[in-house]
Design a protein with these regions (language model features):
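Glycine-rich Rossmann-fold phosphate-binding loop(s) that bind the pyrophosphate
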Residues: 12-13
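Rossmann-like NAD(P)(H) cofactor-binding subdomain of soluble oxidoreductases
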Residues: 96-162
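Conserved N-terminal Rossmann-fold NAD(P) cofactor-binding segment
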Residues: 37-80, 309-316
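N-terminal Rossmann-fold NAD(P) dinucleotide-binding loop
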Residues: 16-17
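C-terminal substrate-binding/catalytic lobe of Rossmann-fold NAD(P)-dependent dehydrogenases
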Residues: 142-148, 157-318
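Conserved NAD(P)H cofactor-binding loop of Rossmann-fold oxidoreductase domains
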Residues: 87-89
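Conserved S-adenosyl-L-methionine
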Residues: 25-31, 143-145
Length: 318
């Protein structure tokens, strides 16, 4: 098998370590680097993952590296083609993503500065919350072209929507196609007009009230998991989404995925990072793919853009 380069995951919490394991098991990279500021944690996790290689049959090497906020240890990420930033505080029950903003902004800023220093050609995939704001901050701090900075949100939200539809109708998840745009938060915009089950419009299978109930459940999908866990937040589905994005970049696949990307004129929206569908390849976002939205859906997307724009401007000053 031909492998491609090096990918780094910053943050060895549940989210980051699970992402690293998924990336290693793809067996398409020469090396997966996992970093964290907790001494020994990434090294121990990397050792554990490497010991799974004979069982799972992958040859990708996993390297763990303890780092410090001042930059020690970051030389391990040098030459990374992709960097996934998962570092930051997770939500707790009762918290919104915005409650994390000040602390996580400092973390994302610090990490991004080290990425610029050691992996200046990397594609950045941001997953730290609040997602849209942290993605915009990473883009600003890095100075990278907008196409090389994107955030993981839409894939996760879309997956949650699809699962809830499949669960409600009792059908295989593979038969369901859904889409969510907008922000990774209160102004998330699930798009019922784009939803089908075995090619049939969702509106033909469920009432408007039933669909709206699933839309609301999707918006609260992360909070529902957190409330059940009591400690920590979701990481199985989020890590699957982040790893899938990284794979699309590594393989230059041209896959069309819902991601947080820079919007510059699409949908009549400009100058903001927002959840949209995008074609993903080696250089990051190749192009935004516009859907034919209903008037209410388009209005909701534009409202989401304005709400996110104001928050992104505030974060830039932190």
């Amino acid at each position: 098998m031909t492998r491609t380069g090096k990918v780094t995951v910053v943050g060895a919490g549940f989210y980051g370590s699970t992402t690293a394991q998924r990336l290693a098991e793809y067996d398409i990279f020469d090396e997966v680097v996992l970093t964290d500021i907790v001494e020994g944690k990434p090294e121990g996790q990397a050792l554990d993952m490497n010991q799974s290689r004979p069982i799972e049959g992958f040859e990708t090497k996993v390297t763990g590296q303890t780092t410090s906020p001042s930059g020690e240890g970051y030389e391990a990420i040098s030459g990374s083609e992709i960097v996934v930033i998962t570092a930051g505080l997770p939500r707790k029950p009762g918290m919104s993503r915005m409650d994390l903003i000040e602390t996580n902004a400092k973390i994302v800023r610090s990490v991004t500065e080290q990425v610029v220093k050691h992996a200046p050609e990397a594609v950045l995939i941001v997953v730290s919350n609040p997602l849209d704001e942290m993605t915009a901050l990473a883009a600003k701090v890095s100075g990278f072209p907008h196409h090389r900075v994107m955030g993981q949100a839409g894939m996760l939200d879309t997956a949650r929507f699809s699962y809830f539809v499949a669960e409600r109708l009792g059908v295989p998840v593979g038969s369901v196609r859904t889409l969510t745009l907008g922000s990774h938060g209160d102004t998330m915009v699930p798009v019922p007009s784009a939803c089908t089950v075995d090619g049939k419009p969702l509106a033909d299978l469920m009432t408007a009230d039933e669909i709206e109930a699933l839309v609301q459940r999707t918006r609260n999908g992360g909070a529902e998991v957190i409330a059940l866990l009591k400690t920590g937040s979701a990481y199985y589905a989020p890590s699957a989404a982040a790893a899938r994005m990284a794979r699309a970049v590594a393989e230059d696949s041209g896959a069309v995925l819902p991601v947080c990307a820079w919007v510059d004129g699409e949908y009549g929206i400009s100058g903001v990072y927002l959840g949209v569908e995008a074609e993903i390849g080696r250089t990051g976002v190749r192009r935004i793919v516009e859907r034919d939205l209903t008037e209410p859906e388009l209005a909701s997307l534009r409202e989401a853009a304005e709400a996110v724009r104001a928050k992104q401007a505030d974060v830039a000053s932190l």
